[in-house]
Amino acid sequence: MGLIEDARRGVVTEEMRIVAAAEGVTEDFVRRGVAEGHIVIPVSPYRKVKICGIGEGLRTKVNASIGTSSDIVDVDMEIEKARQAERAGADTLMELSTGGDFLEIRRRVVEATTLSVGSVPLYQAFIEAARKHGAVVHMEEDDLFRITAEQAKLGTNFMAIHTGINYETMKRL
């Protein structure tokens, strides 16, 4: 059962208890927020993370962004950035690499931190489409679904999904 389903059935999970204690709110406040979609608690079946509640009625969170580029691919530097962000008190981490071996970079970053790690599957899909087909506009939808699943299986806890991207937008990229 997932957190949303548990919350809707009235079940307060361990994650909800942890968030309530950290935020100074009641467990039922967190449960109701999760059930109604106003609070999220990024978790993953693939790895343990520092539990963090994000949403309405909770403190503002700090999200640190890291990632390689086509100009600089230094995984050790990205891992050090992730560790520094965690030491500095970041609540979550976005891994936004656009250069290098995406899965290897993300795997190593995910292994190096206890923070919830987010990603943007569309970035990888665009770059792979440009490499494979010569242009972003030739991206195949199955590639986006495959990449999204791969990133989830690596242990990313949340994703930015760009639902407003359409064919006309892609032609301009």
Regions inferred by a protein language model and the residue ranges of each:
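Alpha/beta enzyme core
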Residues: G2-L173
